[in-house]
């Protein structure tokens, strides 16, 4: 494979035709460093783990989805807005495109879950979820409903800290992702996105109880995360699928 494209705080390739728009709000990034060999079998054929300083990472990302829109139409205020928590890995394809691979995506609106599973072929799951804010503290809870294993979930509380004026290389590596990879019939599919540079804050992890990582095929990931970040969010545009 060619070397990965450079890490950039904004998209290296503009999205020329908008297929979906989304707002990502109150985003928490929890990440654990892991051996690339441990997660390589979980990635789509035609991709390999993306690595920084010899390690790849597993992410647990709770946030609020806001007003999904289709083909430039205004975002949907109810069906397009919901809580979400995803488990993701970091990937590179044969074109050097860096991306993420979702192992699971919990959401508390059933219709978007069904649509994403059918249209985008993404592993969305229906869950009971809450997001609560109390000053600089945010708490995210999730309990899976369908499909199983039922009851897999998470309880995460963080305290938001100071703004990062210059994010370090690890923060850029974990957040500046300009597409996702998923399996396809003829090799990996790449779904590009574009958004402004992330406004990132330090964050302190106050509570973490979760079983989503093990349910996503990552039973060996445990302990305190190596990185805890927060962002108030960005507005995102997705282009058409690419090969």
Regions found by a protein language model. Name each.
Residues 3-8, 76-90, 131-136:
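Short, surface-exposed, charge-dense and proline/glycine-enriched linear segments
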């Amino acid at each position: 494979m060619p070397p990965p494209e450079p890490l950039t705080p904004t998209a290296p390739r503009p999205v020329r035709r908008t297929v979906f728009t989304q707002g990502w709000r109150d985003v928490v990034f929890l990440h654990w460093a892991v051996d690339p060999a441990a997660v390589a079998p979980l990635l789509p054929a035609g991709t390999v783990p993306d690595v920084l300083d010899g390690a790849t990472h597993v992410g647990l990302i709770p946030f609020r989805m806001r007003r999904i829109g289709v083909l430039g139409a205004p975002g949907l205020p109810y069906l397009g807005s919901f809580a979400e928590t995803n488990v993701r890995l970091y990937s590179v394809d044969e074109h050097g495109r860096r991306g993420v691979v979702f192992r699971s995506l919990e959401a508390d609106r059933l219709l978007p879950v069904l649509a994403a599973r059918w249209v985008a072929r993404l592993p969305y799951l229906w869950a009971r979820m809450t997001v609560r804010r109390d000053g600089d503290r945010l708490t995210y809870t999730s309990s899976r409903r369908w499909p199983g294993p039922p009851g897999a979930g998470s309880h995460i509380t963080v305290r938001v800290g100071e703004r990062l004026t210059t994010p370090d290389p690890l923060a850029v590596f974990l957040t500046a992702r300009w597409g996702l990879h998923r399996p396809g019939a003829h090799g990996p599919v790449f779904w590009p996105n574009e958004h402004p540079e992330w406004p990132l804050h330090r964050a302190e992890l106050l509570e973490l109880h979760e079983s989503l990582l093990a349910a996503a095929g990552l039973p060996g990931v445990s302990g305190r995360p190596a990185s805890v970040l927060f962002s108030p969010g960005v507005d995102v545009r997705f282009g058409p699928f690419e090969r």
